[in-house]
């Protein structure tokens, strides 16, 4: 796949269009000091990937070990951790191979390197897509548990969850394979952007509706106990803050990458867009940061999972 400068080969095709390449130098001259590339050292990439790898391995291990966590909700959380694990692991592998090749410690034919690059691209793309899907699945699961509490266990059964998980993985692999094969088509990039926006809207609508229901419930309790009105106000502020953090982190970590894809379609030759293209590695680093944050939001808040994790860590010593 074509790449530019020091940028990683992994997903490098997203940041190189034949028509835009001659304009990169022009962008630097026209925008001057404003056109800056945020350099991401390889050591930082490896460190972020390692932290994410350890976190998500612990989540998967804890859920696999404790049978009490073999519910649909934790199955989705486990698959999210596995997706984030693959995102981090593939980036670490790509960075390590690149460093070894540049240092001359690893010798391989160009065809072999190209095949390895394509495999890593497919793994990374499929894990990104599956990660977004499982974030949406977790939101849907929580929504059903709140609005259809009495019927939850008949609606969200383990077999249905397993079928949904299998469908997500298969669809992610197939879509990522097509994406790698036709990465230079604008329609492919637009499909990815639309998919991201759909997941963002889905999560925002569901979580806002859940927050409204929780505030309504707290308000009803406050009416019965007038002294608890201040507590109700505090609950509303806390819920709004939690929702803002959850959606804010999702948008901050994933948004720049999909903005990058959008600009490739809309303005591949514009100097300002070319400046944004130079920060492709930063956008990948933000996605890895999201893989670090996901366990803190969705997994480690569970008391049962933390207890199991503590047992796993104690047994390993």
UniProtKB/Swiss-Prot annotation:
GO cellular component annotations of the record: cytoplasm; plasma membrane
Segments in the Cytoplasmic topological domain: 64-72, 141-163, 212-240, 301-317
Topology within the bilayer: Multi-pass membrane protein
Residues with a covalently attached lipid (S-palmitoyl cysteine): 315
Disulfide bridges in this chain: none
Main location: membrane
Residues annotated as transmembrane: 38-63, 73-93, 119-140, 164-183, 192-211, 241-266, 280-300
InterPro entries named among the record's database cross-references: GPCR_Rhodpsn (IPR000276), GPCR_Rhodpsn_7TM (IPR017452), Melcrt_ACTH_rcpt (IPR001671), MSH_rcpt (IPR000761)
Domain of life the protein comes from: Eukaryota
Database matches in CDD domains: 7tmA_MC1R (cd15351)
Family assignment from sequence similarity: Belongs to the G-protein coupled receptor 1 family.
Protein name in the entry: Melanocyte-stimulating hormone receptor
Gene: MC1R
């Amino acid at each position: 796949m074509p790449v530019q400068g020091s940028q990683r080969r992994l997903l490098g095709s997203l940041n190189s269009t034949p028509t835009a390449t001659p304009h990169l130098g022009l962008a630097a001259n026209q925008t001057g000091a404003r056109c800056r590339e945020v350099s991401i050292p390889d050591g930082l990439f490896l460190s972020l990937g390692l932290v994410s790898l350890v976190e998500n391995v612990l989540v998967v291990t804890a859920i696999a070990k404790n049978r009490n966590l073999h519910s649909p909700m934790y199955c989705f959380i486990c698959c999210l951790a596995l997706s984030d694990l693959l995102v981090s692991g593939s980036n670490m592998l790509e960075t390590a191979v690149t460093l070894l090749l540049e240092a001359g410690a690893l010798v391989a034919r160009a065809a072999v390197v190209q095949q390895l690059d394509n495999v890593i691209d497919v793994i990374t793309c499929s894990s990104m897509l599956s990660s977004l899907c499982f974030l949406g699945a977790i939101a849907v699961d929580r929504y059903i548990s709140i609005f259809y509490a009495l019927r939850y266990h008949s609606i969200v059964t383990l077999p249905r969850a397993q079928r949904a998980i299998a469908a997500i993985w298969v669809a992610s692999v197939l879509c990522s394979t097509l994406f790698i094969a036709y990465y230079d088509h604008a329609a492919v990039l637009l499909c990815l952007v639309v998919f991201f926006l759909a997941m963002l809207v889905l999560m925002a609508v569901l979580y806002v509706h859940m927050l409204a229901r929780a505030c309504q419930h707290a308000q009803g309790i406050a009416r019965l106990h007038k002294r608890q009105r201040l507590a109700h106000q505090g609950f509303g502020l806390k819920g709004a803050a939690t929702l803002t953090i959850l959606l804010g982190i999702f948008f901050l970590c994933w948004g720049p990458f999909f903005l990058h894809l959008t600009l490739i379609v809309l303005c591949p030759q514009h100097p300002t867009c070319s400046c944004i293209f130079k920060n492709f590695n930063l956008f990948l680093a933000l996605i890895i940061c999201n893989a670090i944050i996901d366990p803190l939001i969705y997994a480690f808040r569970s008391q049962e999972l933390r207890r199991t994790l503590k047992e796993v860590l104690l047994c390993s010593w």
